[in-house]
Structures are given as C-alpha cells and as structure tokens.
Design a protein with these regions (language model features):
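Trp- and acidic/polar-enriched beta-sheet ligand-binding modules for extracellular glycan
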Residues: 1-61, 71, 82-164
C-alpha cells in the first residue's frame, strides 16, 4: 500500500487490498456489504452486496472508508450477475473527514456530503464506467453509494491516487 502512495500510481481506492473498509450500510439482506470492496470479479450474486426489495421513495446506502485520502478520477459500478435485481440508479457522495469521529457520527453526517456523481441510471449485468460525469472534488477519504430503490452490486471501484 505504501508503494502506491509514494509512486502516485492509479489504484482502486475502495479496495480492501489498499486499506479500504466498510463502516456502515442500511441493509445487507441478501449479500454482505464487505463483498463490494473485495478484489477481483464477483463469482455470483452471493459474492456481491444485495439489499431487500423496497417500495416507494426509499433508497439503500453503503459507506466505505479509504485506507488513505485520495483523489478519485474514475468510478466503476459493476452489476455483474445482477440481472433482475440490479438497482435502477445510483449516486455517489464523498467527504474528507479529518476529525476522529465515531462511525455513527460519520453515518449521521453523510446526508450532507457533496455529490461527485449525481443520480445515474444502471442496467443489468454490466460494468458501468463514470469518468466524464464526475463532479470534480479535492481529496476524499470516505465514499457513500446510494442505490435507488434497492438491488445488488457486485463491485464498486473508485480509481485514483492517494494524496497527502
């Protein structure tokens, strides 16, 4: 991990291999949240994050803490294996939190984080790449994915660089 920081190599900031971790989510009915930051391609639906069906204007969310602060250049939302149970759309919010806060405080305050990806359509069994749609930000160390209204995601990848 330190090598990536020193040589400014583009890496997956949301990978468990680069120190990322899940700090919370509102639902993991069918698939564990930790699966979404695992390395490699999802083996099946059970190897992704999937929430229970909901109706109305509800949405599901998950928050990832990076191993170190980074600058996101490209997002990849992979719905591989999710054909009838993928989210209709998603949005991404980020924050750079420098205070030592509890996970509960971070989750509570995530409602006001800045958007780097406004609500965008998703489709079944596909790797969705978002580069030109990203709203430019400075360094971040937390990422929140909101899925509307529910569904499954195999992997999320935020490619960028660690920054000081």
């Amino acid at each position: 991990m330190e090598k990536n920081f020193l040589n400014n190599k583009t890496i997956n900031l949301t990978s468990v291999l680069n120190g990322a971790s899940i700090i919370g989510c509102n639902n993991e009915h069918f698939g564990r949240a930790e699966n979404i930051i695992a390395p490699g391609k999802g083996k099946n639906m059970g190897d992704g994050w999937e929430t229970r069906r909901s109706r109305g204007k509800n949405f599901d969310w998950l928050i990832i803490k990076f191993g170190k602060p980074g600058l996101i250049k490209k997002l990849e939302i992979d719905t591989h294996h999710f054909k009838g149970n993928y989210p209709d759309s998603c949005s991404i919010q980020t924050a750079n939190i420098t205070k030592n806060l509890s996970n509960q405080s971070i989750i509570k305050n995530s409602k006001i984080w800045k958007y780097i990806l406004n609500k965008s359509k998703l489709s079944a069994h596909k790797k969705h790449i978002f580069k030109k749609f990203l709203i430019k930000r400075s360094k971040e160390n937390y990422l929140k994915i909101n899925i509307f209204p529910d569904g499954g995601i195999s992997r999320i990848r935020a490619f960028g660089n660690f920054v000081k």
